[in-house]
Regions:
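Acidic, surface-exposed loops and disordered segments
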Residues: 1-213
Length: 213
């Protein structure tokens, strides 16, 4: 699978098979994370590999996401925020988030290449994770990746069409209206999601108000 196809088809598993994930594959995934771009080349990221069922259950409880217990392997992505702050200054947290996001994307891409599926979990109980896994004060968990062989085929999430999110020279100048015959994939995709539903609601409300006036 080439990089473009991997990016377009990347999705999160819904249910994990109990087949073990080979450590050779885990190592390759971690190498991808280790080589992520880093602001100022600080290289703030660190990783904890979790395999024990009891430990995975802790992650599931802290995050409210049962997939982290189902998946045979989880990786806690950490950032040494103190190290980043010394180099970057007050914007250190944004820099750590950027580095972590870049690492996670690369790790998930390699996981897909290796025939695995993954999920990226944030919004968990930070203190529970720090306490449960002995993480020091200057290091912050940025997210958790679950790795598995999926129990069923993983479908990528729906995306906005390119003409809804790509503009030319100025905002709202849709790129498809500028380049006649442009053959970019996704250019003619239209997705029935939030913005369009909001627009429909607005016009229906406007019609009702017109009837009342």
């Amino acid at each position: 699978m080439n990089v473009f196809d991997a990016v377009r088809n990347l999705g999160s598993f819904r249910s994990a098979d109990d087949k073990p994930v080979e450590r050779k594959k885990v190592g390759k995934i971690l190498e991808a994370g280790r080589h992520a771009p880093s602001p100022g080349n600080v290289q703030s990221l660190e990783f904890i590999v979790i395999e024990e069922e009891e430990s995975r259950a802790k992650l599931a409880e802290a995050s409210g996401d049962p997939r982290l217990e189902e998946a045979p392997v989880a990786v806690i992505v950490l950032a040494d925020t103190a190290r980043m702050r010394r180099r970057i200054g007050d914007e250190f947290h944004d820099a750590c988030n950027a580095e972590a996001a870049s690492a996670v994307q690369g790790m998930r891409m390699v996981a897909k290449e290796e025939g695995l599926s993954s999920c990226w979990v944030t919004g968990f109980d930070q203190m529970a994770v720090k306490t449960g896994f002995g993480i020091p004060e200057n290091v912050e968990p940025m997210g958790i990746i679950g790795l598995c062989y999926p129990r069923s085929e993983v479908e990528p999430d729906h995306r906005f069409g390119m003409n809804e999110v790509v503009f030319y020279e100025k905002y709202d100048n849709q790129v498809g209206s500028v380049f006649d015959g442009l053959e970019w994939e996704g250019l003619h995709e239209n997705t029935e999601i939030a913005s369009k539903k909001t627009k429909r609601f607005y016009w229906k409300l406007k019609e009702r108000l017109s009837d009342l006036i």
